[in-house]
Amino acid sequence: TSQGTTPDKVQLEVNCISNLPNNEVEETDLLRELEMIEENLFGKELSFVPEENRNSRHKRCMGYDIECNERLHCCADLECVKTSGRWWYKKTYCRRKSG
């Protein structure tokens, strides 16, 4: 087992996975069991995360030296800059902010 887990916790997780739900009530019960497993494995700090924050996805951003445009924005510490060069001429790439 990995650090912080016990055979009982692992067995509980295996039981949850092997007994897939057949209806909405069973799905709710399974969700509660999985939340208990998360709490046991990762601590109680996960149980305090609001539901909308836990399920929301962060917007994706382009990293350094990745092509960018008006739909694909650069990450916070980068800016979309037009480059000069050979085949990549007139394309924009994410570069570190100047100044």
Swiss-Prot record:
Keywords: Cleavage on pair of basic residues, Disulfide bond, Knottin, Neurotoxin, Secreted, Signal, Toxin. Disulfide bonds join 61-75, 68-80, 74-94. Expressed by the venom gland. It comes from the Eukaryota. The keyword Kinase does not apply. One of its GO terms (molecular function) is sodium channel inhibitor activity. It is found in: Secreted. Transmembrane segments: none annotated. One of its GO terms (cellular component) is extracellular region. The keyword Cell division does not apply. Pfam families: Toxin_22. InterPro entries: Toxin_22. Belongs to the neurotoxin 14 (magi-1) family. 09 (magi-1) subfamily. The presence of a 'disulfide through disulfide knot' structurally defines this protein as a knottin. Inhibits voltage-gated sodium channels by binding to site 3. Insecticidal neurotoxin. This is Mu-hexatoxin-Mg1c. It comes from Macrothele gigas (Japanese funnel web spider). The lineage of its organism: Eukaryota, Metazoa, Ecdysozoa, Arthropoda, Chelicerata.
